[in-house]
Amino acid sequence: MTVHPDHYLIAAPVARLIEEFARLPGIGPKTASRLTFYLLRAEPKQAQALAQAILDVKAQVGYCRRCFNITVDELCPICRDPSRDQTKICVVEEPLDVLAIERTGAYRGLYHVLHGHIAPLEGIYREDLKIDELIARVRSEPVNEVILATNPNTEGEATAFLLLRDLAPLGVRVTRPARGLPTGGDLEWADPETLGSALEGRREL
């Protein structure tokens, strides 16, 4: 990927860093260039701290063996917390969605992170998500409600429909956050009040 058509004017290490930044989601060529030139002006220790933080995340952070949220231990803090309601599992697409829901203070159950959504056009199918692991949890844990908090967009609705089909034979209550979240949006961008109200007013499927 070449970000600059006049890349021959830019030193190779600079061009490479611009291209690496531009690979990140939500960062276009202009932002990638600004970040790169900011780091060029920064003190060496600041650039070293950034590089070390990236390496530390990759080396130290993994996924909870129970819910697949991010963690530095075998189990995440939520799964280790005995005060959480063990009878409820809130299913979300990404770890960022867990953070968004936790900020509301409206939910005290457990989570299950799918790490994506059904999107055949993008080559993402059922087997690419943590769905079998969710079904295994519902079968083996004292769960009486599964909240399908996938994003309120086409992919999220399709994923929720598939999950409902898979959960139906297990005899567990399946709910979805109430209408009120912006259609087509992501949970991580919803304000805490709106998201909290949607969770408290969740509807049965």
Curated annotation (Swiss-Prot):
The keyword Methyltransferase does not apply. InterPro entries: DNA_Rcmb_RecR, Rcmb_RecR, Rcmb_RecR_Znf, TOPRIM_dom, TOPRIM_RecR. GO terms for molecular function: DNA binding; zinc ion binding. A zinc finger (C4-type) spans 64-79. Residues 87-182 form the Toprim domain. It comes from the Bacteria. This is Recombination protein RecR. Belongs to the RecR family. GO terms for biological process: DNA recombination; DNA repair. Keywords: DNA damage, DNA recombination, DNA repair, Metal-binding, Zinc, Zinc-finger. Signal peptide: none annotated. The lineage of its organism: Bacteria, Bacillati, Chloroflexota, Chloroflexia, Chloroflexales. CDD domains: TOPRIM_recR (cd01025). May play a role in DNA repair. It seems to be involved in an RecBC-independent recombinational process of DNA repair. It may act with RecF and RecO. PROSITE patterns: RECR, TOPRIM.
